């Protein structure tokens, strides 16, 4: 038996055809969000605060220290934040201590009286200084006096210590120390929900992780085409700060070719690398000693003007470098040296980050450069004991032992350079042979010691980089591939927020220093020293405007999960899609098990937006790791799972997971297809170091949801993975018969299901709540019911447990949308036949049975939110009211007494949802008007109807209404609203959309199509046993697309349906051909799954057998109701006066260049003329045409289109005069309006002519032509031929 029965949960069992035993369980799929935010809260904020505190004043007399900090309770719950359109956040408070230390001369005379008691003098002086009488003397110890100053009873008193240094005749010289402490508000910080999202202004947002180039040292080489010499490059790239770029050069001096080494500091002009070392205070002799007189450095030193006097040489080099960095400015040698040191060695200006230091140590330490090299000297410890003998070859077997010896920092030398440069002053130095075979010439390797941990660059780093670069020509070390995932790291949510927090604190730091310098520190309070606004502003800007803060894709649970696991190379500090080449978008060998090679967008972002693979994790340095099992002597160690980065797996041979093995994990094959350094490798069993944990570890969650993925072409698999995210939740979700086994984990971690937080017993269940009793006591889970998602789909949760059930932690107890019994269910299992049908499935179109529509198989619900704000205007308050002037009772039929639509009402386009009137500008009323107003009330009031109406396509049933009133003295229970808003009313209208012609559907294999015909059940073909076919697909859609997975799926689906079983067939390790044949035979299927179909219309069988089976089909969120659109009267573009385009603008259809050619080709001159004039931008013509149609007159001759007028004005704007000449030779100005034949009196009041003044040049002749035309400001442009009310609305 090739399968086992697997229990998914208490309700679902499946036949599991998984081949690889001991499958590692999936990690928390949204851990990349939740775990890193938790790190930010506990450690990330602390790290930033440690960088800035204590804050010293400019003169050093006062210091602000941080004692502790913490989050307070959130002001709103997640549910409240969503309902009230607020931010789900919590305030951060810090306890700060301000210490001030000053020397003061205190006069003994007060109010003309000289005091001689020190305590009296000090008390009087303090009262004057602090302008306070609340000073209490506490104690005296010799010449030290201690006081307390109470500012507020609720706050801690200030402590003041005064030490008398000298008692003069008229004054006391004292040292005054003041200690103030208090709690300070640092701002509100958005919190992450349990689902890994942020609630910003009521909407769920996701911070997408960013894939960027890691800080570190990078090496490259290229051939100089002129000289034929190889040029070597090295870059040291920090996260923030100055770049150092090294390059070798080939020059000719006389007949000698020399290869000096140059460096560019922050993209400045290049200077020799040795001059930089000299500027650090390393002498010429030391440079040559460190590098054993390397010929490149000897030649480079010859380029420097060195006279042999260390001080003069140092001064010259420092000033020369300063001049190049600052583009010609000069400075003293001390000033220049200070400047160079500050841009390279100051932690505040130069930040390598932990990841950068990790990469530098990995790249520049000697142990990582000597594999397959022969050591040319004895390696000894401090006592000259030989640890590694000369002529030892370093290979795969002894590298670990040698690395451990080198980690003890043996063979290190001390560096001698300027004392004010910080950092490790040691490097490791070992000689190896340039050629391991000949063993003649040696070269020295300079590398970092294990004690290098600084997060800024050090002189040791620079020397090691130079050494690495010099040794590349002997093939010691390797050049870097920038697209390798070992050189790209992920900035997760936690790090991105930490960077924003750092920027905010940087601004606060500057403000605090200024305040300490300018304030009277005797009177200042700690609570007022810090203003949190800069921090709050930066955080708000990041969440609202950053490219990485995205409105969550919430069509279904899978799209939500994918959004949280997304990696983007775009955004600030990343790439831009215009400049990104093909290489960076391509699939790289290091993506294996880390980034999905399939799932990526199809448009301009292809390859720049990726998804994490199923088992991938991000380590503490931001590098993506993937798990492997250790293999020792051909035996798989199932209990030893190691997560490796792309760099770590480089020198290991890794086998695929589907090898043949016995029950003890012994590999049975002798030769195994493996990977080594990114290439395929046929390895012997004893060579294997690691083995994959699962065949699906290379793909993402969405991709691993495709059964028979291995039988699909990659292009179609990409479409399949992307379209699963677009499937709308259906009202009767159905889990797939043919699943891949990831459906449970995807549903559990999506954030839409309700998951048990602990082991417990279910005590109570209904449609709104589940109550459990566990270790922590009674716990209540609230279920959402018809909530609107970000994408307008409905979020409804339904319980799948009953009272008395024992639930385990992590078990799904209530399904979310698109879930069935705790499994992801984004579509329906339908009977599919691959056959043509009267041409109705031409070009991927789909023929469907009416039975599916009647049974509501693909019916979905969609919720629209309509918001009305009641404002306080300058003319008076707006009112929500039923009695709206000039509105019929028929129009108000759905409104209650308050003027708000009743819940449950079915509303159509144009119906009033909320009645609202806005006062117009009130004039001073006469006594008669006041009397009329008193008698007739609303009727005579000067108000405008501003009611909320159902827009086009918005019809449905009113599902709920939410009212939020502003907080005030009269309404203390209200919510915080902007100043001029009195009330917000939200009306939710739900639509039930059945599937119809024009809707887009797809399978999971990229087989997408539009429904072209829905046939009555009796006309659909059926099987011989009477089973009707639900969907007919075109068989021509399969061969060229090469997505054969869909054919295997229908056969397996049909067999499983007949056996009344559900199956699991995971990607790359599911059913094989033999097993498929077995299950089909078990189900009694013959002839390779092909059957005789009967034509429903004639009752005759089709000529040939047809492939019929069960396929999982999805209804996508591209529905015809959202797309179809027609324009009657609508807006025009301001300048060209042509109709706008697109449904959102109520635009027309574009009649473009090629369509004009088509009419020209037909010779349809009259049609062409009216399309280009009166139907488009002939302003006068279209108004006259409208008038002619309304009054049944003859349609007038077209005039000049406005676009021609625009062209002529643009040409005039260039300084060319343009005019028309008639047959008599008379010149006339080009005018869009024919003034002679145009009489404005013929126009009705509502036909307003508009002419913009933006395009006219200042020319008297032109002005004269237009002098009696009315000009209107751009903002007041009114459309012609609209009713008075419409014009009023649009104004």
Swiss-Prot record:
EC numbers listed for it are 2.7.7.6
Q: Which UniProt keywords apply?
A: DNA-directed RNA polymerase, Nucleotidyltransferase, Transcription, Transferase
A molecular function annotated in GO for this UniProt entry is: DNA binding
Might you name a Gene Ontology BP term for this protein? DNA-templated transcription
Q: Does the keyword Nucleotidyltransferase apply?
A: yes
Q: List the disulfide bonds.
A: none
Protein's UniProt keywords contain Transferase:
yes
Which Pfam families does the record cross-reference, listed alphabetically? Answer: RNA_pol_Rpb2_1, RNA_pol_Rpb2_2, RNA_pol_Rpb2_3, RNA_pol_Rpb2_45, RNA_pol_Rpb2_6, RNA_pol_Rpb2_7
Q: Which SUPFAM superfamilies match?
A: beta and beta-prime subunits of DNA dependent RNA-polymerase (SSF64484)
Reaction(s) this enzyme catalyzes, per UniProt = RNA(n) + a ribonucleoside 5'-triphosphate = RNA(n+1) + diphosphate
This entry carries the following GO cellular component terms, namely: DNA-directed RNA polymerase complex
Instruction: Spell out the family assignment given in the record's similarity comment.
Output: Belongs to the RNA polymerase beta chain family.
Q: What does this protein do?
A: DNA-dependent RNA polymerase catalyzes the transcription of DNA into RNA using the four ribonucleoside triphosphates as substrates.
Q: How does it assemble?
A: The RNAP catalytic core consists of 2 alpha, 1 beta, 1 beta' and 1 omega subunit. When a sigma factor is associated with the core the holoenzyme is formed, which can initiate transcription.
Protein known as: DNA-directed RNA polymerase subunit beta
Organism this protein belongs to: Mycoplasma mycoides subsp. mycoides SC (strain CCUG 32753 / NCTC 10114 / PG1)
Q: Which gene encodes it?
A: rpoB
